[in-house]
């Protein structure tokens, strides 16, 4: 132990702070327990399995003692027909078992082993989803081949419906939030586009309708419908009068937790309604002011006519008084002119 510490002391840093930090600890009280790595036993077991016919000899594969030999990976027996199995089935068998990594044999740390296990579980889920989709598409292609050959009997129609339902289920597993809103919509779409004649006459049309139903199920327009219902919900929540009369602070309080697009749309609608109301108010005020001015104009015209009538009456009275004065002046001058010659003959004398 002392020799090992002496050998490792040459690797220590030479800075004074680091040496003081190391000297604070008693390194002799730490015991290092070494366990022998059983690599020879694992290699011998793998050698026996390789001699028996197993093909799993890569260093990253699972330990040979934990996984049973696969019938598809072993040497084919005569007449067994195992060579006809597809590569997809072999890949499915290999991904069905979790890989058990031995960190001592591979030189991994415990953190690397945990990360490898986590990534392995994610890869298994993705591989299972891909296998479900691949199986659904293979069945769907076989159904289209049956339909294009001239007709589709009743049991083939049932298998095609099962394939379509499997594809829809796989798509819903990838998009669960779409499946909840549009499951009934996609089923109704399939029932609506499938022709009633499933026997001999409608092979091509049934294939096209089934493909359209699959496309509709894989690509549901969930966002548009959800957005449309969202708009209807907020349009019902706030009427036009409430949007116009509500203050900005109250509107912001009511719109907490709403999406940014919806807030912008409602505020634009409120601004449009307020501008429309302002324009209507200005138009009403202009019309009202026009009526007031027209009424005042009529009153002024009536007053002008009345004043004209008064002026004409006063002119007639003046003319009448003038004629009367002239008559009085002429008659008085004739009576007093012969008897009294000293009296002034000017008309101002009678006026005084």
UniProtKB/Swiss-Prot annotation:
SMART domains xref list: BRLZ
Biased composition (Gly residues): 195-206
Keyword set, alphabetical order: Activator, DNA-binding, Nucleus, Repressor, Transcription, Transcription regulation
Matching InterPro entries: bZIP, bZIP_Maf, bZIP_sf, Maf_TF_N, TF_DNA-bd_sf, Transcription_factor_Maf_fam
Molecular function GO terms recorded: DNA binding; DNA-binding transcription factor activity
Pfam families, per database record: bZIP_Maf (PF03131), Maf_N (PF08383)
Keyword Repressor: yes
Residue stretches of biased makeup (Low complexity): 72-82, 207-221, 338-352
GO cellular component annotations of the record: nucleus
Location of region: Leucine-zipper: 293-314
Entry-linked CDD domains: bZIP_Maf_large
Gene3D superfamilies named among the record's database cross-references: 1.20.5.170
Intracellular or extracellular location(s): Nucleus
Domain (bZIP): residue spans on this chain: 265-328
Region annotated Disordered, chain positions: 57-85, 173-234, 331-352
Residue spans of biased composition, Basic residues class: 176-187, 222-232
Region of interest called Basic motif, as start-end residue ranges on this chain: 265-290
Family in the record: Belongs to the bZIP family. Maf subfamily.
Function: Acts as a transcriptional activator or repressor.
Oligomer status and interactors: Homodimer or heterodimer. Binds DNA as a homodimer or a heterodimer.
Name this protein carries in UniProt: Transcription factor Maf
Species annotation: Xenopus tropicalis (Western clawed frog)
